[in-house]
């Protein structure tokens, strides 16, 4: 009797188990490993936020960050432009001060600032004003000089040829003023200057006129004793003078300077020259 009761109980449990299995999908009892179905919603949200915060961002031009970037660039450009403008103004003012100081120094030296009235090798009366606006290379000598004067005039001619090869530079006017007016008349000067640069102008005059021209440039000249033929040598300064278009002496070159060095010096003067007395 007891066995029958136990058997009936087991039979009922088995029936309940079978009905439970048939009425439910077994897949509902298998755990899903994906975050979307099994993980708590707040955990997935945290993971999405984490990935979003660590991903690279590009500022949108219309965004607040883009506007700030453009503002910084504009401010930087304006600041840099202000610095450059200030530097340029200071530089220009410095150049003006240098020019004025140079003018004052030249006035104190008072070299070559006087006028001259001489005859050129064609017999025309010439003054210093005739050469204003031109760069002038000036040499004092005499036509009977055996070697030094021809050498210096050859060097002067070479300097002018070197500068003439650069079309960006203004032309230079070479001048030759005699220190021996007794022998160097107009015809003697005409014969002499033709052996040098074609633009070379020879200038002569009376003893007093020549002496005054030399005095303005502080030229030393002294006649030596005459020989039995009446010939003599003139001892004089051996200097090539550079005069700018304002008619002011600005540099000089002695015998130690060669043609290349002189040409380079003149080129530098030309590049930095600013008219002090504009027309």
Swiss-Prot record:
Q: Which residues form a coiled coil?
A: none
Q: Which Pfam families match?
A: SCO1-SenC
- Predominant location: mitochondrion
Query: Which organism is the protein's source?
Result: Danio rerio (Zebrafish)
Q: Which InterPro entries match?
A: SCO1/SenC, Synth_of_cyt-c-oxidase_Sco1/2, Thioredoxin-like_sf
Keyword annotations = Chaperone, Copper, Disulfide bond, Membrane, Metal-binding, Mitochondrion, Mitochondrion inner membrane, Transit peptide, Transmembrane, Transmembrane helix
- State its role: Copper metallochaperone essential for the synthesis and maturation of cytochrome c oxidase subunit II (MT-CO2/COX2) by facilitating the incorporation of copper into the Cu(A) site of MT-CO2/COX2. Could also act as a thiol-disulfide oxidoreductase to regulate the redox state of the cysteines in SCO1 during maturation of MT-CO2/COX2.
Per the record, membrane topology reads: Single-pass membrane protein
Annotated GO CC locations: mitochondrial inner membrane
* Protein name, UniProt field: Protein SCO2 homolog, mitochondrial
Offer one example of a GO biological process linked to this entry.
mitochondrial cytochrome c oxidase assembly
- Positions of Cu cation binding: 145, 149, 236
């Amino acid at each position: 009797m007891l066995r029958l009761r136990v058997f009936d109980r087991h039979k009922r449990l088995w029936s309940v188990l079978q009905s439970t299995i048939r009425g439910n999908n077994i897949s509902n009892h298998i755990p899903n490993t994906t975050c979307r179905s099994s993980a708590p919603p707040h955990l997935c949200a945290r993971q999405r936020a984490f990935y979003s915060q660590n991903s690279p961002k590009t500022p949108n031009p219309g965004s607040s960050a883009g506007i700030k970037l453009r503002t910084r660039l504009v401010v930087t450009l304006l600041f840099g432009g202000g610095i450059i403008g200030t530097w340029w103004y200071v530089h220009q003012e410095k150049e003006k001060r240098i020019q004025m100081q140079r003018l004052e120094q030249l006035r104190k030296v008072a070299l070559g600032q006087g006028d001259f009235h001489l005859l050129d090798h064609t017999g025309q009366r010439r003054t210093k004003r005739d050469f204003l606006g031109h760069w002038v290379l000036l040499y004092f000598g005499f036509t009977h000089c055996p070697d030094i004067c021809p050498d210096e005039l050859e060097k002067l001619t070479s300097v002018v040829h070197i500068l003439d090869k650069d079309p960006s530079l203004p032309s230079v006017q070479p001048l030759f003023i005699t220190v021996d007016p007794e022998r160097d008349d107009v015809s003697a000067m005409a014969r002499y200057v033709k052996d040098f640069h074609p633009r070379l102008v020879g200038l002569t005059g009376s003893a007093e006129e020549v002496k005054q021209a030399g005095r303005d440039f502080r030229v030393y000249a002294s006649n030596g004793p005459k020989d039995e033929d009446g010939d003599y040598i003139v001892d004089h300064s051996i200097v090539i003078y550079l005069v700018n278009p304002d008619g002011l002496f600005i540099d000089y070159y002695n015998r130690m300077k060669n043609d290349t060095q002189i040409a380079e010096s003149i080129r530098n003067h030309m590049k930095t020259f600013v008219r002090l007395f504009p027309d």
